[in-house]
Amino acid sequence: MAFANAAEAAQKIAYVNTAQVFQALPQREVVLQKMQKDFKSKADELKSIQAQAKTKIEKLQRDGELLGQEEIEKLRIDIAKLDSEYKVKAQALEKASARREAEEKAKLFKTIQDAVKKVADKKGYDLVIDISALQYGKPEYNISEDVIKALK
């Protein structure tokens, strides 16, 4: 008897390919471009430090035999300082970029979750599972395209 009740109360289930929806998000490209713009000055600063170090290394290699010991030592110290500065700033940029990327992704995934809920409510689904947790699902239960449309 308990089985009959469970069968009668069958839930309507769908699945969504969140990765596919994420790739199709129009906001994703906008966020990516904004992040590149926001971090451009720091990336340019790193390129400048690299160029300065390269110039000094080339001078040391090219003119090393013509330079006095004091000049050689000064160039080596300058190169070491530039290398250290580069490493510190590159690490800071990497951390800031990764943190910002995580924040932006979280916002985008929240947008996707809201769209999934909207589509599920509209179509009467009781449960929506991400495709990554699914062994098999009939294509007609895939609501990914509906979610993508809801986001545009």
Question: Could you describe each region identified by the protein language model?
Answer:
Residues F3-A9:
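Sec/Tat signal peptide C-region and signal peptidase I cleavage site
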Residues A9-I131:
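Amphipathic alpha-helical segments
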Residues Q135-P139:
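Short, exposed beta-strand-loop hairpins at the edges of beta-sheets
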